[in-house]
Structures are given as structure tokens and as C-alpha cells.
């Protein structure tokens, strides 16, 4: 399996801070039992980054978080 890099994710979410927030929220959702949007046997944080790198998840993750 290929390594995931920040540069892969930055193509979809160009702001590093927003990238971290989106990945964190998605990883939390995955750890709470939500279904992953890709096939992965990785931990939730890596799965979240892979979803972002593949374009399955984007900035919409930040809009789903209660403010």
C-alpha cells in the first residue's frame, strides 16, 4: 500500500490547518463507528487522510461539526 503524504491531501484541502481539522473530525467519526468511504484496514486517522487524498472527504467535514 502506498504511503499517504500531506501533499496528496493538500491538493484537496489547500490550508494545512483546515486539513488537520477535517482529518481529526473524520477520524473521530470513524472511531465512533461511521462507515469508511474507502476500503482500508488502517487506524481511523490514516483512513481519514486516505479519504481526503482520494477526494472522498473535503472541507464539508468542517461544516458538519457543531459550532
From Swiss-Prot:
Signal peptide: none annotated. The keyword Calcium does not apply. It is an enzyme of class 2 (transferase). GO terms for cellular component: DNA-directed RNA polymerase complex. InterPro entries: DNA-dir_RNA_pol_omega, Pol_omega/Rpo6/RPB6, RPB6/omega-like_sf. One of its GO terms (biological process) is DNA-templated transcription. GO terms for molecular function: DNA binding; DNA-directed RNA polymerase activity. The keyword Nucleotidyltransferase applies. It catalyses: RNA(n) + a ribonucleoside 5'-triphosphate = RNA(n+1) + diphosphate. Promotes RNA polymerase assembly. Latches the N- and C-terminal regions of the beta' subunit thereby facilitating its interaction with the beta and alpha subunits. The RNAP catalytic core consists of 2 alpha, 1 beta, 1 beta' and 1 omega subunit. When a sigma factor is associated with the core the holoenzyme is formed, which can initiate transcription. This is DNA-directed RNA polymerase subunit omega. The gene is rpoZ.
Amino acid at each position: 500500500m502506498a504511503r499517504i503524504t500531506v501533499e496528496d491531501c493538500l491538493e484537496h484541502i489547500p490550508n494545512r490547518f483546515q486539513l488537520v481539522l477535517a482529518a481529526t473530525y473524520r477520524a473521530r467519526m470513524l472511531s465512533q463507528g461511521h462507515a469508511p468511504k474507502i476500503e482500508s484496514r488502517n487506524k481511523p486517522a490514516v483512513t481519514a487522510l486516505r479519504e481526503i487524498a482520494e477526494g472522498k472527504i473535503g472541507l464539508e467535514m468542517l461544516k458538519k461539526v457543531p459550532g
